[in-house]
Structure formats: structure tokens, C-alpha cells
């Protein structure tokens, strides 16, 4: 099922003609994923970009401001990664776990925004949040995260 995020899968099933009560009863969870290129561990370097640099790389303003004090890594390039700065892939995930509230929203044919709000209140993380944790761990770059999520 192709959607932009996990909450969209609930509304997409309705759009495809799946009876809403079946969505609420049969779906236990939805996992959205993106694959980001993994920074080469042999040549990446830590740096602290300015907020302007983050905004220029298409990272939303609220994410840029929330990242204050966070460590960032960037690609350099070496023989081990063929001068690309990347080697391998890392998953960026969003897991929506079905609960009674979300099941009721599915039956009511609620909007994607309402489903997302309920899922976030139940503990779902956004793709951005998971991606930023991968950036902070030095697994990928903020530029790569913006590339796969925007």
C-alpha cells in the first residue's frame, strides 16, 4: 500500500473500498518506512550546521529549531565508499499501532489528520522524529533525511 505515512494507510483503505469496520477490526498496525543512505563510517565528520543551513536543506523550521545542540554528521568521501560519503542504507520508520480510538476513527471515516493526532497521542513517532534520531546517532545526514522525507 503506497502512502506518505502510516496514518494515511487507514484512510487509503477506505478510499480503496475496504469497509471501515473491517479496517478497525482487521488491522493491528501499519509500518511506514523509507530507506536513507547510511553515512560511511570511515569518512563522515561531525559538524554543527546553522539554522539557515538546515532550512536550506529543506528541513522544516520547527525541526531545525528543535535540533539546537544536536550533533550532526556529514559526508566526505573516501576510497571505501567510492567518494560518495555513503555506504549502505538505514531504515526510517513510523509505526501506527491500532487501538480502540483509531479503530473508531476508521469506522467513522475520519480524516488522516484525525487519525494521525490520535496515533501521536498514543505514542506514535513521526518519520521526522525517527529520522532525526538516526541523524543524531551519526547513521545518516540531515540532507539525506530531507531527500527521502520531503
Task: Give the positions of each predicted feature.
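Short, flexible helix-loop junctions that flank or precede catalytic/ligand sites
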Residues: 1-150
Amino acid at each position: 500500500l503506497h502512502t506518505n505515512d502510516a496514518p494515511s494507510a487507514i484512510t487509503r483503505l477506505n478510499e480503496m473500498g475496504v469497509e471501515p469496520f473491517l479496517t478497525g477490526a482487521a488491522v493491528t498496525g501499519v509500518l511506514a518506512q523509507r530507506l536513507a543512505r547510511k553515512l560511511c563510517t570511515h569518512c563522515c565528520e561531525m559538524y554543527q550546521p546553522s539554522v539557515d543551513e538546515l532550512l536550506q536543506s529543506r528541513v522544516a523550521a520547527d525541526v531545525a529549531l528543535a535540533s539546537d545542540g544536536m550533533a550532526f554528521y556529514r559526508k566526505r568521501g573516501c576510497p571505501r565508499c567510492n567518494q560518495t560519503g555513503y555506504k549502505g542504507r538505514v531504515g526510517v520508520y513510523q509505526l501506527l499501532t491500532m487501538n480502540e480510538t483509531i479503530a473508531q476513527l476508521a469506522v467513522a471515516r475520519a480524516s488522516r489528520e484525525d487519525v494521525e493526532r490520535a496515533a501521536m497521542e498514543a505514542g506514535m513517532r513521526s518519520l521526522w522524529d525517527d529520522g532525526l534520531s538516526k541523524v543524531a546517532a551519526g547513521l545518516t545526514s540531515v540532507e539525506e533525511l530531507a531527500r527521502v522525507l520531503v
